[in-house]
Amino acid sequence: GDVGSPWGIGSQYGGHKSTHPELGSIEDFKSLVKKAQDLGIEVAMDYALQAAPDHPYVKDFPQWFKWRPDGTVQYAENPPKKYQDIQPIYFESKDWKNLWKELLDVALFWIEECNIKVYRVDNPHTKPFYFWGWLIGEIKKKHPDVLFLAEAFTRPKIMNELAKQGFS
């Protein structure tokens, strides 16, 4: 069957701070990262800020997502595509402080628990620039060696703004 988007993060097994059991445990991932680093290789972690429909955030924090008047999720659209297996995060939610703290905690979890030093960020240009400035700034206070790589196929002006926000 259709397993959905690889960027539709989370399932009934957990969210952004978990691994799917079919892919191994957190301990397995830590071992992978350590072995790679022992060989002089850095593992770049994908940092995709959206959720699968069965992500725990959707049930526990519905205010972190945009909803249509009929109660259905306002899916991300990138014409001609409609990403109906991805629920975009609403960065300007009334509960934005708790949302942003959680997103910071996600990044710090992988840095501090698994020694991740490189993030490949999915479509950062589709999220508020001021969020990235804040998030990257907070992480760099404790972990100045962490790199943020922008996966952004966009105009040079936008890429320049992402660089100003802390992307490498």
Model-derived features: where do they sit?
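Active-site beta->alpha N-cap acidic-glycine motif
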Residues: 16, 46-52
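Alpha-amylase-like alpha-glycosidases and glucanotransferases acting on alpha-linked glucans and related
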Residues: 9-12, 19-23, 27-30, 34, ...
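Catalytic PLP-binding core of fold-type I/II PLP enzymes
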Residues: 37
